[in-house]
Structures are given as C-alpha cells and as structure tokens.
Amino acid sequence: MSYLRFEKALMTNLQESLPKELLRTNRSGAYSCSTIVDCNTRKYHGLLVVPVPELDDENHVLLSSLDVTVIQHGAEFNLGLHKYQGNNYSPMGHKYIREFDCDKVPTTLYRVGGVILKKEVVFQHYENRILIRYTLVDGHSATTLRFRPFLAFRSVRQFTHENSTASRDYSAVDNGIKTCMYAGYPDLYMQFSKKNEFKFCPDWYRGVEYPKEQERGYASNEDLYVPGYFEMDIKKGETIVFAASTSEIKTSSLKKLFDKEVDERAPRDNFFHCLVNAAHQFHRREKNDDRYILAGYPWFKCRARDTFIALPGLTLSIEENDYFDLVMKTAMKGYREFMQEKPISVHIAEIEQPDVPLWAIWALQQYAKETSKEECLKKYGKFVHEIIQYIEANKHPNLELKENGLLYTNGKEKAVTWMNSTANGRPVVPRTGYIVEFNALWYNALCFAAALAGMQGDETEQQRLLAQAEQTKQSFLDTFLNEYGYLYDYVDGNMIDWSVRPNMIFPVAFDYSPLSQDQKKKVLDICTRELLTPKGLRSLSPKSGGYNPIYVGPQTQRDYAYHQGTAWPWLGGFYMEASLKLYKRTRLSFIERQMVGYEDEMSYHCLGTISELFDGNPPFTGRGATSFAMNVAEILRALELLEKYQY
C-alpha cells in the first residue's frame, strides 16, 4: 500500500480533494503547484512558475494549466477542472480519476469508458522545465489526445485579464510551439515527444476563480489565454511526453530525460522520506552557484533568520553536511558585507534583523555537534569571532550590549523578531527592549565562542568570554525569571510583558542556558500546560489577553491572529529537544506521540510537507504558506534527536 495514495471516492469529492495541494520544485527557484485534482485554487498555483529576474524578484506563472481531452468515436471527454464564479466547476474532469499516487512522482490514473490513461509529472532539476508523461494503459478503439494550454504570463502577486496588449504570435519549434505574451518575459516552449498538429484558435477563458484568495480577502478571479490546442493519436501501451520550458529541447530526448528524472527521485514512502523530499524543495541554486534556503512556498523568498534556523535541520539532520557548507558560505558572505557596511551581494532578505547573527552562531553550534568542534573551528571559528566582536562593539544598528551584559533592541516602531506581523504600519506584538530569546541566544553564543577559543588555545579570550557569559546569566535571571516560574517575553524599563509565550522554550532547549535544571522544568511545564498542541507550540497562551487562535479572513484580521495564539511546528521542535534534554528516555513515548500530529500532515494540505502555521484550537487546521522551511527543518532535527535518545 502506497504511503500517499488516494482512491476514486476521495478524488471525486471536491470537498476532500481540493484542500490537498501538491508542490514540485526545480531547486533553482521555479516550482509547479496545484491541487491533487489539478484545479488551481490560488493565484500562486500554476504548472510552470518561474523567476523572471529581468522583470523583478517575484515568481511568474507562465503556464497556468494544461487541459487534456480524450477523443474516441467523435466523443470528447475533457479531463480538466477549473472553478468559475458562482461555485461552478468545469469541465469536471476529476470525475474520471480512479486513483492518485505520489510516492515517487505524482501519478494520476483516469478511466473514460474503455480508456485508461496514466499521467505522471516531474520537474527537471535545475531547469525551468516541467515534464508530463501520458501512457495509454488500455484503449479498445482509436484514441486521440487534445492538449489545451492555459497561459497567464503574470506575477504570482497579480492577476491577468483579457486585453489587446497580449501577443498572439507564436512560432513552430521541434514538435511544438513557442510563444510569449508580453515583452520582458522569456519564451514559453511547449513540445511533445511525438509529432502533433497544433491548431491556432486563440481565445480567453474568462472568470477563472481562486477560492483560496477569496478566503484571504483578496481579488480572486482572472482570465486565462489559450492560444489553441495540440492533437495527436495515441495507441495502447504508447507513451507521450509533454515539456513546458523557457528553453527549447530536442524532443527525441524527452522520454529518456523523463526516465532519468524519475530514477533520481527518492520515494516518499514514509514520514521521514517525505520530510527529506520537502527539505530539498527549499534549495535554491543561482547561476553564480550561490546556494540559498527559501523560507517557504508558494510566496516566501530567502530570509536571513529563517535560513539560519532551518539550515541545520534541512541539511545536517539528513546527513547533507556539504549543502550546509554551501548555504553557509553564501550567507556568511552576505553577513560579512552587512557587518562591513558594504552593498549586499546575496539575495537574502531581512539580513539586518538583530537576532540574525545570534541564530547564525546557533546554526554553527549544531554543525559542531554534527561534525566536530575542531571542524567547526577550522571552517567557521573566525566568523563566530567576528560576530561576537561586532556585537560587543555595538556596531549593529539595532542591537546594543548594555552594561548589565544583556542585549537591547528597539522594536516599538518596526517588528524585529520572528513575531513580525504588522497592522497599520506598526507591530501587532511590539516586542522591544530586552527580548527573552535574543538574550538566551547571546548567552549560548558567548559560551560556544568560549569553547572554541579554548580549543584554539586562547585561554585569555576564553576566560573573558566566560566572564561576560556569567554576567549575562545573572542579568538574564534578574530580568526575565518571574515569581510564577516562567519567563517574561520582553522587558523594556517599566514595561514588562507577562504574556505566556513560547519564546521562553529556547533557553530550555539550548546547550548553554542561564537557567538551572529546576528552572527549566518549571518553564517546560508551563509550556506543556498552556502552549502545547499536536501541531507545535501556541504563540500565546489561551489564558493571556488577546488570544486569537484562528488564522482566517482578510489580511488585517489574519495579521492580528498571526502570533496571538496560532500554533507553530518549528517551536514544537525546540519543545521536543527541551523535553528530551531534561527527561531523556523517560519522555521518548511522549515525544513519539507528539510526532503523530506532524505525520498526519503528510496527507493533508500540501502533501508530504508541513504548513506554515496552524489554528491554536481544534481541529488545528493548517494555514498560511503550504510548505514552511523552519517547520520541516525542526521536525527533522527532532526526529534525529529522538533516534539518538532511543539508542
């Protein structure tokens, strides 16, 4: 039995099949994403979605979808599916689906009368090329396939509508055509492995609707351009490969290329393998060979904080240390440029956020544990030292080392932590002053840097850092630990935030912590009682004021809920780490039960990955981005920790 397989009953029930999405990426920034019944429900959905750096830094939907029609004895059966206004779906091709399986590659089996047609999809690695293989498994009569492409040529942030500006020009290429709707865009090549006839009959399909955008309070409909259709006969047992790309390909190579791409795919036959596949989808390799971690799909770009938090789990936890080095090399170059006040040459957003250097050291600490401190010192010791010096010299524009040894930051006017939602131009959660995880990270960084200095034989520097850490530890306890046994979220003069928030889990989970064992247990206990859900830790306790756990509605409504009670799986990773460190093997069964909630997500929402956040109340529905790097990373890291404690 396949791990990710759905039968006819589910596939033909749109209430069950439409919420399930599927993502494929090329590891260079392009992706293909839709629902498992190929009905686009978001403006971000498309069969071929690619970066167009000549225009902007967004992805662009070139090919929205490809409708296939089976023709026998003059009767036509369209396998496509689109939603139009008024809850109208057409042409209802999902009713022909018999099963869907995506253990290795997404495979859909259609049955139309005596015809059984199999469709398999792969996205070629490092190329802007989607490949679809059609196989006529059975057919008792002469069969013709008609392919009708729906084109958008627009940013994922926008919509397209019928207009007179769009070019209808096209040129014949090897077994296909190339076309480009607007200046500045690359040509779209649509080719087949078999000779075909292209019928030019341009038309606009009007009023295609995307219900997910409607739910999010945005405009939700557009018009899609269809230049015509391709037709060809297909015999029983025959395969035809379709390619959509921004470059031409020799069509005689398509079948071998498809086989090669399939052979390179790892099966998604269990929870771990699904997460490994998801981890690879966040990879982005640029033409200059810079490597990045994308924060999530379908709308996030590369962000500095997300990169350093996600990097260990997405690489070290799946034994891909080399990719850690490649990403760290790129990120390190960018952060050194930032520290030296030079133009940033890498494509990493939010590199100026004050906790970024602290998370960078945390990531390198994980590298040291996975390899060795000697290896880390050799490759990254200088970078750690540079960061410590930079912070101590108060050169960061929004991070000040105070005389008490704590780090102070100004977050009143602009969000400066991972709780970064804003409304009306101001932070919804104005975390400012002494921020609990910033200072836990700082203490951890000082101790780790001291350990590296000791290995280097620099005893003077080691003792200096340890003395600084001791001062930070005492000030941390004096500032954050309250009479009820948990930690204030932030403190700024007389302003003390008593809210029970998950940021206090970090000093419990870190290798170097200012908290004693008893203090850690009290903090963990409160997190368990008030914040823990099957999908991670809530961003705010239900007992705290302003609890707003359901992430739905227009932008402003969602912004106010974003960090006010929603649950975040990546925080659950740190929670599980803290639990295992404190209670070791006695918590194994408890942590294994926690993993069930994350494994359930493999067959919901975006298959084989984990959504950005979840409602904080049952049934803990997945929301936000359909695949989120920090969530996948921290669950992978927790799985690795779980395995280490089991043996």
Language-model segment annotations:
Residues 138-139, 160-163, 172, 234-236, ...:
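Aromatic-rich carbohydrate-recognition surfaces in CAZymes
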Residues 1-267, 271, 298, 320, ...:
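Terminal accessory carbohydrate-recognition/targeting modules of carbohydrate-active enzymes
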Residues 282-285, 289-302, 340-359, 363, ...:
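Carbohydrate-binding/catalytic loop surfaces
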Residues 78-105, 112-116, 393, 525-535, ...:
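Non-catalytic C-terminal accessory modules of carbohydrate-active enzymes
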Residues 198-232, 418-428, 432, 543-559:
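Glycine-rich phosphate/pyrophosphate-binding loop
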Residues 252, 367-379, 448-464, 518, ...:
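Inter-helical turn/loop segments and adjacent helix faces that build the functional surface
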Residues 244-280, 309-312, 319-329, 517-530:
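Carboxylate/His-rich catalytic cores and anion/metal-binding grooves
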Residues 273, 392, 399-402, 443-525, ...:
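Catalytic cores of carbohydrate-active enzymes
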